[in-house]
Amino acid sequence: MSSSLRPGPSRWRRAASIVLAAGWSRPETATPPSRPPPAEGFRLLLLQRSPHQGFMPGAHVFSGGVLDAADRSADWLGLFAPHHGPPRFGLGPAPFSRTAFPSLPDTDDHKTDNTGTLPEDVAFRICAVREAFEEAGVLLLRPRTSPPGPAPGPGLALEPPPGLASWRDRVRQDPRHFLRLCAHLDCTPDIWALHNWSAWLTPFLRGTTRRFDTAFFLCCLREPPPVYPDLAEVVGYQWSSPSEATESFLSKEIWLPPPQFYEVRRLANFASLSDLHKFCLGRALEGLERWLPIILLTADGMVHLLPGDELYLEDSDFLENLMSTEKKTEEIMKEGKQFHRIVTYHRHLYDIHVTVQPKYKHVYPKNSVVRKSHL
């Protein structure tokens, strides 16, 4: 196998995303009659990005966006007081910070002076909540008088305020207005409802200039909130269970980028929203492991190598490298045994192969090998 070094290092922009899972225990009442309750008992909010977006145009993704200085501002301290405050804001002991790569470089904002700002795990949660409001009109807020800490069960989103469109326009233009909206509603971002789930870094690909270091949080709601796409970054949405999203992807109704497909398949492990919520609470102290996929180009496809795979090289050269081989994907698969990889045959056909054990009390997807009829 060979690699090709790209001149000049990339930098990742820090970002946060919410995987929003909502209970769905009874049939919908829409006319004409729509889908029955999903087998999993919950559905995920998938937002369709505008085809005019520069990054992943047209993809169905989880809500999220780039961390802004306003998300870390010390101005939030007054809103969280007196019930919630430094050092942990009721989030419990600090989780471990883990990385599966030995020498990840600093992100753009590490060189700024963050003295007096909020802890990172608070700021990332505020960012994720703000983006859910901007993109989907979903308000994950909690009254200021509520006790801190995670709720024993899934919660509810706040009803949209009067003047939703006006508030959203202001927040989109200046994220500092999100603090003002929260103060107006006498609420705080419900950072306690966001559970550590995963963290993905954009791998190196030729022609790709945008790279992100994204923390994914899982939020469980008892029922789906109303969704109002902003019709700018987001042009549509759907609620889909893991099995429904997989089938929509394979039938080319939607396109899921590899990280989203992996997470959808990971969530297929859970039989109910209650099981998922309990699982999140049970691994709250394990933190997020940051994964940097390494791309292996084969003669007839592409393999996203993930930590633990026997071909995954924890070498800083691959921060800016592709791996390549003249062998076909099938040959590569026959040669190995220790797999943690996403095999991409084309835009709407991925296989997931996992033979390694999960770490840090997490779960990995089960092997997901598509029927040959899709080829």
Curated annotation (Swiss-Prot):
Keyword Zinc-finger: no
Disulfide-bonded cysteines: none
Short motif Nudix box, span: 116-137
Site keyed Important for coenzyme A binding: positions: R49, F55, R210
Record has Magnesium as a keyword: yes
Cofactor names: Mg(2+); Mn(2+)
Locus of motif Microbody targeting signal: 373-375
All residue ranges annotated as the Nudix hydrolase domain in the record: 15-263
Keywords: Hydrolase, Magnesium, Manganese, Metal-binding, Peroxisome
Family under the similarity heading: Belongs to the Nudix hydrolase family.
Name recorded for this polypeptide: Acyl-coenzyme A diphosphatase NUDT19
Taxonomic lineage of the native organism: Eukaryota, Metazoa, Chordata, Craniata, Vertebrata
Encoding gene per record: NUDT19
